[in-house]
Regions:
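Acidic catalytic loop of the alpha/beta-hydrolase fold
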Residues: 156-160, 185
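Accessory cap/linker subdomain of secreted extracellular hydrolases
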Residues: 66-139
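Short beta-strand/loop motif that positions the catalytic acidic residue
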Residues: 145, 151-153
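Cap/lid segment of the alpha/beta-hydrolase catalytic domain
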Residues: 1-19, 189-202
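Alpha/beta-hydrolase active-site loop
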Residues: 14-33
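Catalytic active-site module of serine/aspartate enzymes centered on a nucleophile-bearing elbow/loop
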Residues: 186, 193-224
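Primarily recognizes the serine-hydrolase "nucleophile elbow" in alpha/beta-hydrolase
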Residues: 30-85
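Short alpha-helix in the alpha/beta-hydrolase fold that links the catalytic acid
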Residues: 147, 160-170
Length: 224
């Protein structure tokens, strides 16, 4: 998910930019088409949705794009909301520092130091990736996609709330939209509306993907 445990080995990401992932996705689409797959559908989850939007612009081999819990606003806005939900009301100073760091990265400026609590998020070795990612607006990118699009959000997603799906659908009126009742950010069903209630959805690998999501995506692909 955006802004959470982004890199487990940050030193390996020192030179990576979002465009690398976009290029990889486009290359895979080309490869699969060359292997005889008649329709290649890119399905992106969370930040992967933005990658899918951009990759679909780079190759004619993509037949459709599916956005699952994808951000509908620029990354800095999403990050500010996520951090606010975690840090307020007790850590206002830390939130302000995080927002200042994010603003600097969006201007293309590297940050030499940050509070220890934010070190994992803004580690110097991943700042190049942050800077590249902050240049994109998902609403602008989805407007450029010319193939069929399905935008899916979960009404119990605490990381990327369903208004993000609404924003994407508004930016690209041709897109089909579906809001899945009870679906969380990890694409699993949960009735609890608090972060602590959703621990299982994030940590229990035995929980299945929301069957309503599977049905919606399957119907979309079969209809292409």
């Amino acid at each position: 998910g955006i802004g959470a445990s982004r890199f487990t080995e940050p030193e390996k990401m020192a030179d990576a930019v979002l465009g690398d992932f976009i290029g990889d996705a486009a290359a895979w689409a080309d490869y699969l088409a060359g292997e005889g797959f008649r329709r290649v559908v890119l399905i992106g989850h969370s930040e992967g949705a933005l990658i899918a939007f951009c990759a679909a612009q780079q190759t004619p081999k993509v037949a459709a794009v599916v956005s699952l819990a994808g951000a509908g606003y620029p990354l800095d806005e999403i990050l500010q909301l996520q951090l606010a939900s975690q840090l307020l009301p007790d850590n206002m100073d830390l939130l302000l520092q995080a927002n200042a760091i994010t603003a600097a990265l969006k201007r293309g400026e590297r940050v030499e130091s940050c509070p220890p609590q934010l070190e994992a998020l803004f580690h110097p070795s991943v700042q190049t990736f942050w800077i590249s990612s902050l240049r994109y607006d998902p609403r602008e990118e989805i407007r450029k996609v010319r193939v069929p699009i399905l935008v899916v959000g979960g009404d119990n997603d605490l990381q990327v709330p369903p208004d993000n799906a609404e924003a994407l659908a508004k930016a690209q009126p041709r897109a089909r939209k579906a809001i899945i009742a009870g679906m969380t950010h990890p694409l699993k069903k949960c009735t609890g509306r608090m972060r602590i209630d959703q621990t299982g959805a994030y940590g229990d690998s035995t929980l299945p993907i929301d069957p309503d999501l599977v049905a919606v995506v399957t119907q979309f692909i079969r209809g292409l």
